[in-house]
Structures are given as C-alpha cells and as structure tokens.
Amino acid sequence: MKATCWILAGFCLLFCCKAEEGLNFPTYDGKDRVIDLNEKNYKHALKKYDMLCLLFHEPVSSDRVSQKQFQMTEMVLELAAQVLEPRSIGFGMVDSKKDAKLAKKLGLVEEGSLYVFKEERLIEFDGELATDVLVEFLLDLLEDPVEVINSKLELQAFDQIDDEIKLIGYFKGEDSEHYKAFEEAAEHFQPYVKFFATFDKGVAKKLGLKMNEVDFYEPFMDEPVHIPDKPYTEEELVEFVKEHKRATLRKLRPEDMFETWEDDMEGIHIVAFAEEDDPDGFEFLEILKQVARDNTDNPDLSIVWIDPDDFPLLITYWEKTFKIDLFRPQIGIVNVTDADSVWMEIRDDDDLPTAEELEDWIEDVLSGKINTEDDDDDDDDDDDDDDDDDDDDDDDDDDDDDDDDD
C-alpha cells in the first residue's frame, strides 16, 4: 500500500470554516503526538497505549515533493492521534532503513502500510490513509469482536447489512466453550468481517439456527450458507472464512480498498462502477446482484463494485486511465499490473444490459474470449495507423520534391 497516495481526503479535516458550537471539526492544535519509534522507546510505547498504530515508511528523500508528501502523511496521523488521545490510542513512525532491526522484531513488512498493535494481535490497516477513514477503523477495533443480538429490532438491523460479509451463531451463553471459540475466531478478522451471536431462542428460530450452529452470509445474497459439522473449533471457523472471503460481488470500501484490489483473479478484476444513489446506477446494481446470486457457486467469478461517490478524488483518475464516463454505469475487466482495461459497450442509460446479457459478457471474460490483451492489440493497431500516416506524409513530401525538380 502506498500511504502517500490516499491522504488528501482526510487532510481536508485540518481546515474548518466558522461553525456553530457542536459542529466544530477538529484542527491540529500544534502538539506533536506521533512518536519516532526506535529500539529504546518502543517497549514503553506498547505499554502506554491500549492500541499503538505504526506507519512503516521508506526513508524520506531530500527533494521538496517527497518532503511535502511526508509532512502531509504525518499531519493525517497527528490529527488522528489528537482525536483519539482520550481513548488511549497512540501513533508512531518506523523508518524502514534506520530502524530495520526494530521493524523485523515487530513484524513490519510492507513499506507504506499502517500496523495496529492491540493486545497480542498485529492488524494491518489496508485502506485509504485519510484521517476520517483511519479514525473510524480504529474505533471499530475498540469494540467487542462479536456483537450480540437478543431482540427483534436488533435482528432487523442485522438484516439491513447486505454489502458486507457477516456471520451469526446461536449459543447457550457467553460462558459456552463454543461461543468462546467463535469469539476468538472473530478476533482474526476484526474489523473487516462482522461477527454476530444470539443467546435468544426466538431470534435463533427466526434465523433458522440450531444450538452451536453458525451461518455465513455472503454480500448481496438472499440466503446464508450453513457452516457444516457443528460445533466448530476456532481454527475451523477461521479456515472457513478465509476460504469463502472472496465474494461473488464485493464492494470496494475505503477501509480495505487495497486488500480488495490486491485480491485479484490471476491479475484481473471484473470491475463495475455504479452510483447507488443514482436511479440508473441503482438499477444496474440490482442487475449485478441478480447475476451474482445466479452464479454464486462459480469460484472463478468475483465482481468488484465501486461506487464513485465513495472515492471522489479518484473519479478523474479512473476516467482518464480507463477512458470511461463514470456518470454512467460501467462494467469491464482491468489488468491490475498495467491498468489495461476492456469495457462492455453500454449504449445509453435507457438501455442497460439485462441480467442475461451481463452473464453472456461475463462468460466471454471467464473463457478468455474478452481480455485486456485485445486492448493492447488495439493500441498496436493505432500505432500502426500512425506509422502508415507518417509514411504517407513522407511519400507526399517526396512527390512534392519531384514536382519542384521538374
């Protein structure tokens, strides 16, 4: 993850306009809270805070641009540290060259990544390094790894969550060994995967759960998957979630965007752009959901849905890179190595593809009939055309010279 690329969205929090009391956005107060961590002070820092967040960064170059980028990154961390100071969350930086020995000791591997130490766990933040995104992520980490549901209203709230992976289990109580195994499994995925539990017989009946049984909900699916062979050990639950974590249709979220993008299918993503709040975008998304439900058993299919409204700073970049209009629904394949892409031809918003047409297009993608190499061939053809034009121009120039000689 390249930390400096995604900080501008949170950097805007450093400035504020005059507002009524109760809506004052925090501004940096000038106090330095981010620690330059080294072998002498790291043990004290780990003991001092309930959670410690460390940015593992490459050595900062002396050029002006690199210095500015680093200062802006540091400012994002400083503001987050200021906001979260009352909650005993500390922040620090580790230089990959100067503090290489410490980095190895702490298990820091990827430059540009932010690592969170919570008790005995090390969690990598793989999202947009913006103050608001980071603060929300850390507040989620402070919560219990399992949320308990014991009423009809809480069950309704659970049902409303449809764009994320979630698990729910029915247990005798908090002292149950099977619940404890479920809770320990949840810690492996917090806060990226939501774990729920109920001790209420009525709630369990509505969910169709038997004692010590756990259901796994894939995003946007109508029905859950019963995890087989109950009761489960912690290891069995962890293994099941890892095996089924790549959903048929998954949403790109600021808090884990890099992890999702890196989880490609042999270097390729099927990407769909659709604004959920836009009528055409909503309609297109519903078609995508239907396609995903009809093909949920296909292990080779995974579509990444991106709502452009979630990433306003990236809209211009995506439009320029992929040569598409993001004010309209789009679906295509993207090569994650070089960003080459091929997009389905959607004539206009009034003529969106049907679920059957989308399935046919996806089938062509999965079979290799449609691929990003076609895009390279088109580029080569364009280059050849340019060369031919240049040759024609040269021939014309030669003819003109002959005429002049005559």
UniProtKB/Swiss-Prot annotation:
Family annotation (InterPro entries): Calsequestrin (IPR001393), Calsequestrin_C (IPR041860), Calsequestrin_CS (IPR018233), Calsequestrin_middle_dom (IPR041858), Calsequestrin_N (IPR041859), Thioredoxin-like_sf (IPR036249)
Gene Ontology BP annotations: regulation of cardiac muscle contraction by regulation of the release of sequestered calcium ion
Signal peptide start and end residues: 1-19
Tissue: Skeletal and heart muscle.
Glycan-carrying positions: 335
Major site of localization recorded for this protein: other
Domain of life: Eukaryota
Keyword field: Calcium, Glycoprotein, Muscle protein, Sarcoplasmic reticulum, Signal
Residue ranges, compositional bias (Acidic residues): 373-406
Chain spans, region Disordered: 365-406
Location of this chain's protein in the cell: Sarcoplasmic reticulum lumen
GO cellular component: sarcoplasmic reticulum lumen; terminal cisterna; Z disc
MF terms (GO), sorted A to Z: calcium ion binding
CDD domains: PDI_b'_Calsequestrin_C, PDI_b_Calsequestrin_middle, PDI_b_Calsequestrin_N
PROSITE patterns listed in its UniProt record: CALSEQUESTRIN_1 (PS00863), CALSEQUESTRIN_2 (PS00864)
Family membership noted in the UniProt record: Belongs to the calsequestrin family.
Biological role stated in the UniProt entry: Calsequestrin is a high-capacity, moderate affinity, calcium-binding protein and thus acts as an internal calcium store in muscle. Calcium ions are bound by clusters of acidic residues at the protein surface, especially at the interface between subunits. Can bind around 60 Ca(2+) ions. Regulates the release of lumenal Ca(2+) via the calcium release channel RYR2; this plays an important role in triggering muscle contraction. Plays a role in excitation-contraction coupling in the heart and in regulating the rate of heart beats.
Listed name of the protein: Calsequestrin-2
Annotated source species: Gallus gallus
